[in-house]
Amino acid sequence: MAKKSMIAKQKRTPKYAVQAYTRCERCGRPHSVIRKFKLCRICFRELAYKGQIPGVKKASW
């Protein structure tokens, strides 16, 4: 889990647009965030296995 101070800091609008970054909406993780779902890879994987993300299925080839 992310620190509460970091989550609060990220909610403020940055002085410059370059300073903005994505953060997982479920756990607050700043790295490896999938933009389309606004989730980190770990949360995305958990929810996909449970079938809670519509239209997502495990790939096999």
From Swiss-Prot:
Single GO term (MF): rRNA binding
SUPFAM superfamilies on file: Glucocorticoid receptor-like (DNA-binding domain)
Biological process, per Gene Ontology: translation
Binding site for Zn(2+): C24, C27, C40, C43
Coiled-coil ranges (or none): none
Keywords assigned by UniProt, alphabetized: Metal-binding, Ribonucleoprotein, Ribosomal protein, RNA-binding, rRNA-binding, Zinc
InterPro entries linked to this entry: Ribosomal_uS14, Ribosomal_uS14_bact, Ribosomal_uS14_CS, Ribosomal_uS14_sf
GO cellular component: small ribosomal subunit
Transmembrane portions of the chain: none
Cofactor: Zn(2+)
Entry's cofactor comment: Binds 1 zinc ion per subunit.
Quaternary state and interactors: Part of the 30S ribosomal subunit. Contacts proteins S3 and S10.
Role summary: Binds 16S rRNA, required for the assembly of 30S particles and may also be responsible for determining the conformation of the 16S rRNA at the A site.
NCBIfam families on file: PRK08061.1 (NF005974)
Family under the similarity heading: Belongs to the universal ribosomal protein uS14 family. Zinc-binding uS14 subfamily.
Name of the protein in its database record: Small ribosomal subunit protein uS14B
Species of provenance: Listeria monocytogenes serovar 1/2a (strain ATCC BAA-679 / EGD-e)
